[in-house]
Regions:
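Charge-rich, intrinsically disordered N-terminal extensions
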Residues: 1-149
Length: 149
């Protein structure tokens, strides 16, 4: 089998030192997670074997996205998680940076609907791309990975 469906990851407790948790060749605290040990398919583009978090400048948002990515790595294929974080989420992060929102807890229904309109009217994204972006955002909010301020 070329890829694990989900990874067996260490459970994070409130007192866990996050810098001690390894994800592939990376530490949880790194801004790039190297997933090459888990993605062995020769046909996978090299750049698709990494989850990149550098595009998220807000520390609380970045931590929430990392928690979500870590959780999802235990549930689905690493490539899918990489797509969620590096293909579908950047538009959301851009929109909320522009609008001064720094926590998933602060996202209102009106904000969410305006994000949808912004993707359609300003970014001119395809319906499928917009749906995928909204799915990831909605899931992060629903699951409830929020950092206290």
């Amino acid at each position: 089998m070329a890829t694990n469906l989900a990874l067996q990851l260490q459970v994070i407790e409130p007192d866990t030192d996050l810098s001690s948790i390894m994800i592939g060749n990376s530490r949880y605290s790194d801004d790039v997670w190297d997933l090459r040990p888990f993605i062995t398919a020769k046909t996978t583009n090299e750049s698709h074997k990494y989850i990149r978090f550098e595009y998220i400048s807000d520390a609380d948002m970045k931590e929430t996205v990392k928690q979500y990515a870590y959780y999802k790595l235990g549930k689905m294929k690493p490539q899918t998680v990489r797509n969620y974080i590096n293909s579908y989420l950047p538009m959301f992060i851009e929109y909320y940076s522009i609008n001064g929102i720094h926590s998933f807890e602060d996202v209102t229904l009106e904000d969410y609907l305006n994000f949808n309109l912004w993707m359609k009217d300003e970014k001119k994204v395809a319906t499928g791309t917009g749906n995928n972006s909204c799915h990831v955002v909605e899931e992060i909010i629903r699951i409830g990975f929020h950092q206290p301020r």
